[in-house]
């Protein structure tokens, strides 16, 4: 179907939803690299005007990647919640935006329709929204998940403690874990990106995390962010696996470039569930995503990178995850050039993920060769905290010495907690109080005398 829009003496034509969505996207380097971005600001506005008039039902009839060639498209269509969609089925994309911003779109009503919203609908409406719109609507979305604690409750923000080390040195990792715990981080998980893919090393790191969590009785979960096939093998060997991790993307071809498909993810989830390691819930999948991953694998099918990203959330949604996060600026300036593009993408990702019913966090980050700095990350972190982000990263000094990129620190998390009054997962907050690390108001006690005790228990 061809979509047309007249502006002045010019008629703009867009050949199908795929092109319409791409041309309506706010500027970013990845879409320019792919050759699918709008040629001018006027063409972008024309695309948005045409997109606003598209009925939501059209997204169920016109796939941006064909049903026959892509299992993610099949997942989206086959799992669509028609009863949930009924409440918004009469709306256009523009009307959907108006409804989302209205008082009628409450946390309860958004939860009822979330499974009826396809990723392309979410991506489409986001392209009509200013940053403040993305923040306001995401704030209304209530999404919780649970394993050893409860994540995503109103007025709370969690932190993944990220103690990476360039040589997977257990002492260095343990020191970073101690640093994070004393600063109140780690309720989302303690998650290590390993430098090695050797199963023996991964197993050692899993046992390290399990020992620390067990000895200190921390109500949290450990994760080593290795490939899902490695995790499956280690589960078979009896390793103490809490969360099953995998990077995912929004097309079948992109996921195959990662070495995964939906069947493998189902197998991994079932294996994780068989261990029964959760205490307050059984959400155990952890997914990471990021705009540009499909394009980097030449697996984007000329779909814009933000719509591809939203489609990755359909994959995540199928597996009831504990955690999902966009690593928003990690892929580099070829896909998100500067601070402005990273900030916009982070807000889009959080909005789309929450709208689709996911416990979405964001790694507020950039690479050292991007036109961005820590002030840009302060801005994005503050906006996401205002939007109710589920979790962020806690990296010592915000500088990941293994992955060589800049993220957010334990102190950055304390900043937004103070600014917005955000608490941690309730079970984790209670543990901090019992351990003497926080006072009765859940503020860190700053008791330096506890350092030797905790250090000795960590390395026991």
Predicted regions and their residues:
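Anaerobic metallocofactor- and corrinoid-dependent redox/one-carbon enzyme cores
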Residues: 1-176, 182, 187-460
């Amino acid at each position: 179907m061809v979509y047309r829009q007249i502006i002045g003496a010019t008629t703009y034509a867009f050949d199908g939803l795929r092109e319409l969505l791409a041309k309506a996207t706010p500027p970013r380097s990845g879409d320019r690299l792919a050759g699918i971005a709008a040629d001018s600001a006027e063409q972008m506005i024309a695309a948005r005007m045409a997109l606003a008039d598209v009925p939501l039902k059209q997204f169920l009839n016109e796939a941006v990647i064909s049903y026959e060639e892509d299992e993610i498209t099949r997942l989206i269509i086959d799992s669509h919640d028609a009863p949930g969609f009924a409440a918004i089925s009469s709306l256009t994309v523009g009307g959907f935006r108006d409804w989302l911003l209205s008082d009628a779109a409450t946390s309860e009503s958004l939860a009822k329709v979330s499974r009826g919203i396809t990723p392309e609908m979410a991506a489409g409406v986001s392209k009509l929204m200013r940053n403040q719109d993305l923040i306001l609507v995401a704030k209304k979305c209530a999404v919780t998940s649970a394993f050893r604690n409860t994540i995503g409750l109103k007025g709370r923000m969690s932190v993944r403690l990220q103690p990476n080390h360039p040589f997977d040195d257990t002492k260095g990792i343990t020191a970073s874990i101690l640093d994070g715990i004393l600063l109140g981080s780690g309720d989302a998980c303690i998650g290590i990106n390993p430098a090695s893919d050797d199963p023996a090393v991964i197993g050692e790191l899993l046992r390290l995390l399990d020992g620390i969590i067990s000895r200190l009785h921390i109500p949290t979960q450990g994760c080593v962010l290795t490939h899902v096939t490695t995790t499956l093998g280690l589960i078979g060997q009896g390793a103490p696996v809490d969360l099953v991790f995998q990077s995912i993307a929004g097309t079948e071809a992109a996921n195959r470039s990662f070495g995964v498909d939906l069947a493998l993810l189902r197998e991994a989830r079932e294996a994780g569930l068989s261990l029964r390691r959760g205490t307050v819930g059984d959400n155990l999948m952890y997914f990471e995503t990021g705009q540009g991953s499909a394009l980097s694998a030449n697996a984007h099918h000329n779909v814009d990178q933000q719509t591809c990203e939203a489609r990755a959330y359909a994959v995540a949604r199928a597996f009831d995850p504990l955690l999902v996060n966009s690593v928003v600026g990690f892929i580099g300036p070829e896909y998100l050039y500067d601070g402005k593009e990273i900030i916009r993408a982070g807000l889009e990702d959080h909005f789309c993920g929450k709208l689709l019913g996911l416990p979405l966090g964001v790694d507020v980050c950039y690479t050292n060769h991007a036109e961005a700095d820590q002030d840009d990350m302060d801005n994005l972190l503050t906006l996401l905290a205002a939007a109710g982000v589920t979790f962020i990263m806690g990296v010592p000094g915000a500088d990941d010495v293994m992955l060589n990129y800049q993220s957010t620190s334990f102190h950055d998390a304390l900043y937004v907690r103070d600014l917005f009054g955000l608490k941690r997962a309730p079970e984790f907050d209670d543990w901090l109080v019992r351990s003497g690390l926080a006072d009765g108001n859940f503020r860190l006690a700053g008791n330096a005398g506890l350092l030797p005790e905790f250090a000795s228990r960590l390395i026991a």
